[in-house]
Swiss-Prot record:
Subcellular location: Mitochondrion matrix; Cytoplasm, Cytosol
Pathway stated in the Swiss-Prot or TrEMBL entry: Cofactor biosynthesis; iron-sulfur cluster biosynthesis
Annotated transit peptide: 1-50
PANTHER family, A to Z: IRON-SULFUR CLUSTER ASSEMBLY ENZYME NIFU HOMOLOG (PTHR10093)
GO cellular component: cytosol; mitochondrial matrix; mitochondrion
Protein name: Iron-sulfur cluster assembly protein 1
Cofactor remark: Binds 1 [2Fe-2S] cluster per subunit.
Keyword annotations from UniProtKB, A to Z: 2Fe-2S, Cytoplasm, Iron, Iron-sulfur, Metal-binding, Mitochondrion, Transit peptide
Tissue: Expressed in roots, stems, leaves, flowers, pollen and siliques.
Family per similarity comment: Belongs to the NifU family.
Swiss-Prot/TrEMBL cofactor(s): [2Fe-2S] cluster
NCBIfam families, per the entry: iscU
SUPFAM superfamilies: SufE/NifU
Amino acid sequence: MMLKQAAKKALGLTSRQSTPWSVGILRTYHENVIDHYDNPRNVGSFDKNDPNVGTGLVGAPACGDVMKLQIKVDEKTGQIVDARFKTFGCGSAIASSSVATEWVKGKAMEDVLTIKNTEIAKHLSLPPVKLHCSMLAEDAIKAAVKDYKEKRVKTNGAAAAGETTQA
C-alpha cells in the first residue's frame, strides 16, 4: 500500500484521481454505438410464416452473439417496407443490428445486398475486435433476403401447381 501511495505522490495524483495506466484500460464506445444501444431502432419481430417476411438468423460461436433480422417486402414493388431485429449480444452487435434495419428500409432487395459490414463498422467506428458484429449484420441481411426469395418460390410454385391441377 505504501508503494502505491508513494507512486501517486510522485506522479502528483491525489487519492481520488485515476492513475495514468488505468485510463488505458478503459474501453469506450463511439457515440453512434451508444446511441443505437441506448435507443435501438426497430426492435421486435414479424410473423415468420408471413409470405412477405424474410428472416435471417445468424450467430457467432466465438462470442455467443445471435442476431435475428427480418424484412417485410412489398411483393408488388420488391421494396423492403419495414425491418425488425432481435439480438442477443454485446452493445456493438445490438448497434450493428439497429443500423442494418435502418439502412434496409425503403430499399430494393437487390440494393440491400450491397450493404457491406465495413460500411456498418465505419459508421459505428467499431474497433477491429468488434468487426464480427458488423459481419453478423451483413450476413443477417443476406439470410433474410434469401429466406424471402425461397418463400416466394414456394408460394409461386404452389400457386402454379394449383392452377395446373384446376385446368
